């Protein structure tokens, strides 16, 4: 029986005694030992030891050779063999993937790593430290934690195991809705400080900033505060009462007016401080927190004041140049009878939101009725687009805050279509195989959290961010079961998938092809529904943002299948179900095209439109918002808001494959411009932190959704 040797990279090869003999002879030559018969004898002894086994590790063989040589007459030969083995190990390590990736970081030559995340400034030490940890975490996960077929599928580009630099090496999850209300009203401990309920809005926002930083350092995805205007409203009341008490003490004639005026100023200043805090702090992950504020449904004067303060601060901008703030992402809820139409009590806040969106791109909007229809209840997305389903506690109450997403595995749909070579039957068969593999990968995320104790992340599990107050040695896995947490299957490239399968006509122009695209997503939804039924975990379908993935999958597929027209020829894949960015349509038709997908992929979605400068035509933007209200749950506005600090130009910079340039004076100095683009669901500043090549090309090709002159 010939045993198999398990090599360092995990592959198996047949055992060959000749290789042992050759290695010993090389060591003998280096040691000045001229005894070929002895070398052959040692090789035969080792072979006889190994032949009794079906599988042996390469390190076991080398150790056996060393032991045999050490017991023989030529100690210098044993020493030479050990030194030879050590030198080979060093050379192998230098050539190894781990060493190459570390060198690429240290020497700043690995552009794929350095530009993978547009929110990470890879030039600074804290981020480099995080990237280094990520390289090691990825390597360990691939070598020791994940099933080999999952690793191979990820390496090939069949699937993408998101955030390998954090999970499964660390028992971390993706994104969440912080239970801010519970933390602020019940108090909590952070570090060495016991935090009591705040007594003013300024203190409440200061504490909120610290909570955001702590939570964001313990998870790897987005951090969302759901309905922040309603959560923080009681602290506006507390400030008002303090100011009114001051007015009474000083016998100010109009105590109510004085208190209201001082409260308005305090609230504005509090949210200004919060915005600056978010944009200046760095988490332990080496980046600004991916944080989202959901607001707009509060009806009290305190909630309205918070809504206005958030929007007015965003409009004002950051610093002396009034730069557009990238974070927090703002998501404004619109509800008929509240703020949707003229005459609604909060319609004035909607007008302020329109102005803000035209100048700062945010807020995106949540259309209340559609969100409830598609996801079962109203809530703000976790991060940029991940939505929770309905979950009720033991009292039958719907709970959103404190819940989370455990992670994502995305399918490379265009690759399946390329492998199928135009055969639809083969495509469906391959898709089912990939779905089984994706499920296996997702289950590793769940398994990694089993047995984990609350003490690994006190802010999440012991101090209330996850809506629970566990003890240090309590298991955390229970709070993720029965649909309380979601875990998501992602997908990319419906547009390229249809092109690869059917070619010819554009997806947008064919009702038949549109139906084919929808059918693919329907099959994905059927799969996650089945997994949810079988496991009890909250499997959901997620329309992957694809900041890095649009480039990675396309690059791997180009290497495998070549440049395929309509598929790999652009250098990127289209995000999830989105319309091809080069297709010229009006915003209403784009909404109609994308509207069938969110109800299917209700675990994660967003629709958006590209517009010219509409700061002086807010009615046109409102028309699109109002149209979206009846058709899609979640809508974003992309408008040109770039600024040149050399010549004063405001508008849209020219986007090239190498960067962004002022069209008026040619300035492209990153320190003298402000360039803002929607990366996926979040905004980014590509002038300061460049996109990867695929995302840069996609941004360059985007067209405005104008129609027949209705917009602009």
Where are these regions (language model features)?
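Conformational switch/transducer regions in large eukaryotic molecular machines and scaffolds
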Residues: 16, 656, 681-682
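Conserved catalytic cores of very large enzyme subunits
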Residues: 87, 91, 98-483, 504-505, ...
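Short, hydrophobic beta-strand segments
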Residues: 3, 45-50, 291-292, 496-501, ...
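Long insertion/accessory domains within large nucleic-acid-processing enzymes
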Residues: 666-712
